[in-house]
Amino acid sequence: MSVISMKQLLEAGVHFGHQTRRWNPKMKPFIFTERNGIYIIDLQKTVKLIDNAYNFVKDVAANDGVVLFVGTKKQAQTAIEEEAKRAGQFYVNHRWLGGTLTNWNTIQKRIKRLKDLKKMEEDGTFDRLPKKEVALLNKQKDKLEKFLGGIEDMPHIPDVLFVVDPRKEQIAIKEAQKLNIPVVAMVDTNTDPDQVDVIIPSNDDAIRAVRLITSKMADAVVEGRQGEDDEAVQQEEVAEGVSKDSLEDLKKTVEEGSNEE
């Protein structure tokens, strides 16, 4: 039984890749066809690979592992934050600060500064300081919150990264590779899949596609934490799996043509 249905993927536009001139040849095995200059991703393979990713993340979570959700592009920011929080995990949804993983000790010092500033605001220290100084401290706090708020309570470097658009998150990917941290990622037709450990061939530009896949990874964490016997996070329609009818749906959608990206 698959954790996601072909219908859900189609409705979210997961199958729409990039323009054919912007492709990475290494993604050829995951491409179904080409339509009006756009590559169409093979959703039959995506369904299976989502299952692989789901089980991988679920196993990490079941062993009390830390999952870091990463997506700094505009289309991913909201989903990354909301789904990571729902799963009780951590996230980076604005600019990735170099050294976030490879220089974790320094990052922890900046996080401590953020916590200190928050405490100063809460205990009334700000009320006793000159307005100009408070304005500067607030500016510093807001900046730290923007970039580090999602990992403020992360106990240690993550056990796995879930990434939306590895091309954009190159620094995060390279840091994870240096530390042998596995990467699960949404990989579009313009991306090199070799830099990702567990790939999910997918449109990584459409908000609905990003939300759908990210929510499934959050579901995997929730299920892993609840235990193997608890399947409360799974949707009823998931049981339909991949069928010939589902493939016909994909072919029909391609024929009707829609050049969303």
Swiss-Prot record:
UniProt-listed InterPro entries: Ribosomal_uS2 (IPR001865), Ribosomal_uS2_bac/mit/plastid (IPR005706), Ribosomal_uS2_CS (IPR018130), Ribosomal_uS2_flav_dom_sf (IPR023591)
Q: What is this protein called?
A: Small ribosomal subunit protein uS2
Span list, region Disordered: 224-261
* Keyword Cell division part of the UniProt annotation: no
Example GO molecular function: structural constituent of ribosome
Which keywords label this protein?
Ribonucleoprotein, Ribosomal protein
- Record field: compositional bias (Acidic residues): 228-239
Which terms under GO biological process does the entry name?
translation
Family to which this protein belongs: Belongs to the universal ribosomal protein uS2 family.
Carries keyword Nucleotidyltransferase? no
Chain intervals with Basic and acidic residues compositional bias: 242-255
Which PANTHER family does its entry note?
A: 30S RIBOSOMAL PROTEIN S2 PROKARYOTIC AND ORGANELLAR, SMALL RIBOSOMAL SUBUNIT PROTEIN US2M
